[in-house]
Amino acid sequence: MPRAKTGIVRRRRHKKVLKRAKGFWGSRSKQYRNAFQTLLNAATYEYRDRRNKKRDFRRLWIQRINAGARLHGMNYSTFINGLKRANIDLNRKVLADIAAREPEAFKALVDASRNARQ
């Protein structure tokens, strides 16, 4: 009887890869080699997109702040500059949330920004 050297080890490794590839289309979820190659590509996309997510959200927050500021006759850059002069230290995530959910509070921030610029 021949000696089995990698039987259980290989099976476990393949099962782990195929488990991670669940939900992929066609042979990419059934065959080890295709699944492994697809997972390598998926890992590069994951790595890249974890970094891109930070940029995307910052861009979204800036758009929301700009839209809220323009409703009150001011653009984004002058609004942020006025907040800095007024020593109001709120990050863009919080400002975007206030602009979307609490228009009265955002109007008060716009007024404070406008007063600090004059």
UniProtKB/Swiss-Prot annotation:
Superkingdom: Bacteria
Residue ranges crossing the lipid bilayer per the database entry: none
Cellular component, GO, one term: cytosolic large ribosomal subunit
Keywords: Ribonucleoprotein, Ribosomal protein, RNA-binding, rRNA-binding
GO BP of this protein: ribosomal large subunit assembly; translation
SUPFAM superfamilies according to UniProt: Ribosomal protein L20
GO molecular function annotations of the record: rRNA binding; structural constituent of ribosome
Quaternary context: Part of the 50S ribosomal subunit. Contacts proteins L13 and L21.
One Pfam family recorded for the sequence: Ribosomal_L20
Stated name of the protein: Large ribosomal subunit protein bL20
Entry keyword Ribosomal protein: yes
Role played: Binds directly to 23S rRNA, probably serving to organize its structure.
InterPro entries linked to this entry: Ribosomal_bL20 (IPR005813), RIBOSOMAL_L20_CS (IPR049946), Ribosomal_protein_bL20_C (IPR035566)
Family membership noted in the UniProt record: Belongs to the bacterial ribosomal protein bL20 family.
Organism: Deinococcus radiodurans (strain ATCC 13939 / DSM 20539 / JCM 16871 / CCUG 27074 / LMG 4051 / NBRC 15346 / NCIMB 9279 / VKM B-1422 / R1)
